[in-house]
A protein has these predicted regions:
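Non-catalytic, conserved peripheral segments adjacent to functional cores
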Residues: 1-90, 109-154
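Conserved SET/PR-domain catalytic core that frames the SAM/AdoMet-binding pocket
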Residues: 87-106
Length: 154
């Protein structure tokens, strides 16, 4: 088990109007959330592996569709992966300097809360190749759609 990593089950309440889901409570997290980001990804996209030297924590949730979360403990080499989203409503809390990312298993809306605000003048953004031998077998695709940044990490 990766130290500090948490699975947080999400409850979805539905009625004739639609549904409601609570995504996070600050009181239940080790650090306060300072920024939230919403990303739309097409099926086959991998956004990974990213890490933050200064220890930013991330809380991942897939709010529409399905995504595979992958986490790598850079010190021990231990890995974690889980498919989250509509079929498995779970948030994943990723502490500190662990490398992390996700694969869009379907077109998806992916929400992540972070414990540091992004600073374009001093970004704490670092990468490990998505196909690093420690995690390559955790992805469902061998030919992902990648950003230029994620391609450069390879």
């Amino acid at each position: 088990v990766i130290a500090g990593l948490r699975r947080i089950p999400l409850k979805r309440f539905e009625d004739e109007r639609g549904w409601f889901m609570e995504l996070m409570r600050s009181s239940e997290l080790p650090k306060p959330v300072k920024q939230s980001n919403l990303v739309y990804s097409r099926r086959g996209v991998i956004r990974a592996l990213h890490y933050h030297e200064r220890g930013q924590d991330d809380l991942f949730a897939c709010v529409h569709g399905m995504a595979r979360v992958v986490v790598l403990d850079r010190e021990t080499g231990e890995t974690f992966s889980e498919d989250i989203g509509e079929d498995n409503p779970v948030a994943i809390y990723i502490p500190g300097t662990n490398a992390h990312g996700y694969e869009a298993l379907t077109d998806c809306l992916f929400l992540y809360h972070v414990t540091e605000e992004y600073d374009a003048d001093d970004p704490d953004e670092h990468g490990i190749p998505w196909d690093d031998p420690r995690v390559v077998d955790l992805w469902s695709t061998r030919s992902p759609i990648l950003s230029e940044r994620d391609q450069a990490a390879s």
